[in-house]
A protein has these predicted regions:
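Intrinsic low-complexity, intrinsically disordered segments enriched in polar/basic residues
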Residues: 2-3, 199, 213
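Active-site catalytic loop in hydrolytic enzyme cores
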Residues: 170-209
Length: 215
């Protein structure tokens, strides 16, 4: 075998090995939707109570990880940007999201695509934690998308840890995520379902978040 050909084959073998190692690593670190649990936190502002037959107000909102505002030109919508132009813009968007949630003051708020942990596309901003602390409401949060590194496009999306959050003006006693079938019968990546019971005595109440794209 000629030396140039041998070098080319070695380089190709190394590249194939690196790609295989990357795929194995991504598979090993991806979110296991069957074992994901919802995290419940309690806030001082969740003091409401509901009786059977009461009407409740609901806000459902895909916040787009606070990175898809008017300044963004997202590549999956035909644009050129992978993430918002700057961390300051994501902070501004989060300010607006928190302000709107507080202003509308719904009994139950269902948020989709809110970062559970620091992610590359949102410049490491802890969005779920901001929502908890700044609203002071009881919350239930579960991840539905986690990847240590999304290798596309160029530049790559990078680390993502995103989820679905429910905020309640009434105290949350418990919550659980429920996996449902998605489009074409494929499993969804853990649409969140919050299960709530009033503290103390009384009939149980349930607030379930719809799957992404649902109503």
């Amino acid at each position: 075998m000629k030396k140039p050909l041998k070098i080319i084959l070695i380089i190709l073998a190394v590249l194939v090995g690196l790609v295989a190692a990357l795929l194995i690593w991504l598979t090993a670190t991806q979110l296991n939707v069957k074992t994901e649990t919802a995290v419940v936190t309690n806030g001082e502002n969740s003091t409401a109570s509901f009786a059977p037959g009461d009407s409740v107000s609901i806000l459902t909102w895909n916040v787009g990880y606070a990175g898809l505002g008017e300044e963004s030109d997202f590549f999956m919508d035909g644009g050129k940007q992978v993430r918002a132009p700057s961390k300051a813009i994501v902070e501004k968007n989060m300010d607006g999201i928190v302000s709107t949630v507080k202003e509308l003051d719904a009994d139950f708020t269902f948020l989709q695509e809110i970062e559970a942990d620091p992610s590359t596309r949102s410049y490491g901003i802890e969005e779920a934690e901001r929502m908890r602390t700044e609203t002071g409401l009881d919350t239930a949060h579960a991840r539905n998308y986690k990847c240590a590194f999304v290798p596309y496009p160029i530049p790559p999306i990078g680390k993502v840890s995103s989820g679905i959050m429910t905020l309640s003006t009434a105290p949350i006693a418990s919550a659980e995520p429920v996996q449902v079938a998605g489009i074409g019968g494929q499993p969804q990546a853990l649409p969140d379902a919050g299960v709530y019971r009033p503290r103390g005595h009384g009939r149980s109440a349930r607030a379930r978040q719809p799957p992404p794209g649902g109503v």
